[in-house]
């Protein structure tokens, strides 16, 4: 009876919601700390959604646990259209394989509104420590080390990509885990390991201690047009992997709310000014409605099942 009553209430209230929504500020839950690229991009979208709706985004950053803390908070929120979640691929596709006792269901606990943007990863070396200009040269160099290969990683995505490369190249290597991306990049500059997969934005600025050999996406980036994909670089069986972000809401949000927000978010994602803004972070627009986001989530989840098995990652 309670479920039936809730459904009847939503049906009765939906016309009013459609007419008045949003009538007050909207809370947006983020997975990162304030001031970093994902947070700044979120605020960019928020300002334009405020212009379109007349109501501001109030951002609540809840970093930690690869996005699980934020995802749990969003999933537990009241589905009234006033709590949103800038949902990352890690929380929506990867964590189910990486974490024991996940405190939310990435499929059942959310309503998917729209895709927003994506971030790519690149294969990078310190040329002063690893004298390779191509992936083929890197493979030859690492094989010459006879089992003494090391790589650095900060996130599960970086670890998965590194293990895929080693597997396809027929090389064994030891990982070095870091607590922050900044720390990992500092250690790369110091020549503490042989290679890493890192955020593409680190490849935008020339640096004598950093050389990009390939990009882990399905096609070349317009920001790094001379950098080949892993497939083009000789790893024909490499699966692409990138970080995507979408707008999600708690399960049970009225359809009229989604129908109002989806075209607004999609319009922002397709603007030329958005593409230009995202270039600053080596990010790309990733427009699409909730159906497109669901398909992307399913595909990424399938790929993560492969990566976790390949990298022999045990859920923690």
Describe the residue ranges of each PLM region.
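Short secondary-structure boundary segments
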Residues: 88-89, 127, 199-201, 217, ...
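Sec-dependent signal peptide recognition
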Residues: 1-9
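N-terminal (or domain-start) structured segment
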Residues: 18-108, 146-148, 157-158, 169-197, ...
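Short beta-strand->loop
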Residues: 105-116, 152, 172-176, 194, ...
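An extracytoplasmic/periplasmic, membrane-proximal ligand-sensing/linker region
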Residues: 23-25, 45, 167-168, 255-316
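Solvent-exposed, polar/charged alpha-helical surfaces in well-ordered, non-transmembrane soluble domains
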Residues: 43, 47, 51, 72, ...
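Hinge/capping helix and adjacent helix->loop/strand transition within the periplasmic-binding protein
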Residues: 76-82, 97-183, 230-232, 244-277
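N-terminal signal peptide c-region/cleavage motif recognized by signal peptidases
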Residues: 13-15
């Amino acid at each position: 009876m309670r479920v039936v009553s809730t459904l009847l209430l939503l049906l009765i209230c939906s016309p009013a919601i459609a007419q008045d929504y949003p009538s007050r500020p909207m809370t947006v839950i983020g997975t990162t700390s304030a001031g970093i690229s994902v947070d700044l991009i979120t605020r960019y979208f928020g300002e334009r959604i405020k212009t379109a709706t007349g109501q501001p985004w109030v951002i609540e950053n809840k970093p930690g646990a690869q996005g699980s803390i934020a995802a749990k908070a969003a999933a537990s929120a009241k589905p009234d259209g006033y709590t949103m979640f800038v949902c990352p691929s890690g929380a929506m596709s990867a964590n189910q394989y990486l974490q024991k006792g996940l405190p939310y269901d990435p499929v059942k606990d959310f309503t998917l509104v729209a895709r927003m943007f994506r971030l790519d990863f690149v294969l990078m070396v310190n040329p002063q420590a690893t004298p390779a200009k191509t992936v083929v040269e890197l493979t030859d160099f690492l094989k010459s080390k006879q089992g003494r290969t090391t790589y650095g990683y900060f996130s599960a995505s970086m670890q998965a990509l590194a293990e895929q490369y080693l597997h396809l190249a027929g090389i064994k290597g030891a990982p070095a885990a870091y607590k922050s991306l900044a720390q990992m990049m500092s250690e790369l500059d110091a020549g503490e390991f042989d290679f890493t997969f890192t955020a593409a934005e680190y490849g935008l600025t020339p640096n004598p201690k950093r050389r990009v050999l390939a990009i882990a996406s399905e096609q070349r980036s317009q920001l790094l047009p001379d950098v080949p994909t892993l497939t083009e670089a000789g790893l024909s069986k490499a699966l692409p992997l990138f970080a995507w972000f979408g707008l999600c809401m708690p399960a049970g949000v009225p359809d009229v709310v989604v129908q109002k927000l989806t075209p607004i978010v999609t319009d922002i994602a397709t603007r030329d000014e958005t593409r230009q803004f995202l270039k600053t972070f080596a990010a790309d627009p990733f427009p699409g409605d909730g159906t497109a986001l669901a398909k992307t989530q399913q595909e990424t989840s399938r790929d993560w099942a492969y990566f976790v098995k390949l990298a022999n990652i045990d859920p923690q």
